[in-house]
From Swiss-Prot:
Transmembrane segments: none annotated. Its cofactor is pyridoxal 5'-phosphate. This is UDP-4-amino-4-deoxy-L-arabinose--oxoglutarate aminotransferase. Homodimer. The lineage of its organism: Bacteria, Pseudomonadati, Pseudomonadota, Gammaproteobacteria, Enterobacterales. Belongs to the DegT/DnrJ/EryC1 family. ArnB subfamily. Its EC number is 2.6.1.87. GO terms for molecular function: pyridoxal phosphate binding; UDP-4-amino-4-deoxy-L-arabinose aminotransferase. Pfam families: DegT_DnrJ_EryC1. InterPro entries: ArnB_NH2Trfase, DegT/StrS_aminotransferase, PyrdxlP-dep_Trfase, PyrdxlP-dep_Trfase_major, PyrdxlP-dep_Trfase_small. Catalyzes the conversion of UDP-4-keto-arabinose (UDP-Ara4O) to UDP-4-amino-4-deoxy-L-arabinose (UDP-L-Ara4N). The modified arabinose is attached to lipid A and is required for resistance to polymyxin and cationic antimicrobial peptides.
Amino acid sequence: MSGFLPFSRPAMGVEELAAVKEVLESGWITTGPKNQALEQAFCQLTGNQHAIAVSSATAGMHITLMALEIGKGDEVITPSLTWVSTLNMISLLGATPVMVDVDRDTLMVTPEVIEAAITPRTKAIIPVHYAGAPADIDAIRAIGERYGIAVIEDAAHAVGTYYKGRHIGAKGTAIFSFHAIKNITCAEGGLIVTDNENLARQLRMLKFHGLGVDAYDRHTWGRAPQAEVLTPGYKYNLTDINAAIALTQLVKLEHLNTRRREIAQQYQQALAALPFQPLSLPAWPHVHAWHLFIIRVDEQRCGISRDALMEALKEIGIGTGLHFRAAHTQKYYRERFPTLSLPNTEWNSERICSLPLFPDMTTADADRVITALQQLAGQ
């Protein structure tokens, strides 16, 4: 048997090592010029006026919700089929997450479902660009504008995703992730883009103790060392060590995503003859970033359950992932919302499985996964 093939592996090389070495030798290793360069590069990528680097996408979600003054008595619409950090941040601020169902085959929330969930207490809508494909964001933003509700795009899967010719986040507010399995990574990190100048100013304060400037800003421009606290804030800044890695990865983005796309196409061609169901692609014009390649394993159709398939693949050295278990089935949220029923979400949550997909995979690696799936399907 070949060595273990993980579900994901970061694509790191000599360029990232050199970038880290440069920062370590510079004398300034925390938030500084590499953060500024990363923010500028993201504005060029998405076309937004402002970018705010943070220590994680979760941190970005937290301070974005705070900056929008979301709290007790407010409701925030979000799919249940998402990572629980979004639900956690909403709940920790005292607001109520209103979990809605997704399309059965794209796993993304639809404008119709969002609009049906709006009440006088709705303060924000958080659509997820799932697995690297874009949600129908124009239609969702139109709903937000019509009702006066903020739209926060969960773009954790969407670095390199385009919707109708525009990069995700363009002309809106979106939060990206640089976690270890994402399309670009710096181990841990995130970034918010927005065209709202007041929101950007609030985010910069909230990410760094509520100060109007950070330490590098004071050091560079010779401002008074005793900075003023303008509002209570957090310690969510990104170090320049991390920013340097993310910046180097961003330069490679087109190459990294091209390789992901090639592997995804290899899977798609093979799955056409197998009972495992991949996700459907959105109907609107888009460029898929292929953050994840997800199949649905229905036991009646496939002759094997999802959990049994994942275990069988593990036994022959192939890793898989689960993105995601529905949040409303987690203990805390199950007890808080005991009567909530989301049929499409629940059907998929019990069947989805993420196959290995990362830029350093070889064609032989993908063939190995395909052969294993063929054998497990009895072919």
